[in-house]
Amino acid sequence: VKTTVIINPYAGNGRTEKLWPDIEAALKQSIGPFQTEQTKSQGDAVLLTRKALEDGATRIVAVGGDGHLNEVLNGFIENDVQLNPQASLSFVMSGTGCDFQRSLGISGKWQNAVAELKDAKVRKIDVGKVTYTAADKTQKIRYFDNIASFGLSGAVDHYIDNSRLGNYLGGTMLFLWATIKTVFSHPNQAIRYRIDDGPQEEILTRLSLLANGRFFGGAMYAAPEAELDDGLLDLLMLKEISLAKFLWHLPKIYKGTHLELPEIHFQKVRKFTAESSEQVIL
């Protein structure tokens, strides 16, 4: 096995850079020698992953947060084709949310992820694909391992990316605070959507998501019935809802008891298409 470790030192508001000497030592004990690459800016992980695969790496270990893991994943795939089908992707979560590993039953401590790598068996999982219109009006493609969402969640991510609260709050509290802060300025939005090959319908939604994994937003148990390898995505659309009712029901999403709420549209899908005359944040 030829291993390349790709680190985002900025993950977790710079926490990963401080932890790296300890993570590096633990990784060497767990998986043996490896090559190291560090990202400097957004998008670097995609390019570094592709170069590592071209140079013969058969295992890539992403060290950082969920966003970094997603970038590394996107380095594995180009035009819907895996660059090296024999290569595997592993991770050590040291970012803000650390949500994807929860779907695999790994607790939040990075030491546990490193320990899992020692005798890890390769598991095949599904990957979702998003085609979207970027802010510059160009068409983009992004692959995802965990959850793709739009609406309030996109606004929350934008808030966190531009906030220094991550220096003071842990992942769960940071996402909770950002959600409460953002929801006051984020309205229900009108979208037109189609599920699989069904008819086009319309809905007012504050938040919609397609889930491969079960958790997002710093431990929100958003999709308790999602499976990583069932060939399906769990669609959840939060219908038109008042601000007061949204805040009242918010604790349920941490427990995974929200699916039966009348304000939630839930079903298993293979394909979902949505469009809006409004700007909707992914």
Residue ranges: model-predicted function:
Residues 20-22, 53, 77-78, 161-162, ...:
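Short, solvent-exposed amphipathic alpha-helical segments in soluble enzyme
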Residues 30, 77-206:
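Catalytic core of DAGKc-family lipid kinases
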Residues 17-19, 73-76, 102-104, 221-222:
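Short amphipathic alpha-helical segments
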Residues 195-197, 202, 221-222, 227-282:
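ATP/nucleoside-binding phosphotransfer catalytic cores, i.e., glycine-rich phosphate-binding loops
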Residues 149, 153, 209-222:
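Glycine-rich phosphate/pyrophosphate-binding beta-alpha loops
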Residues 1-63, 70, 74, 111, ...:
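ATP/NTP phosphate-donor binding region
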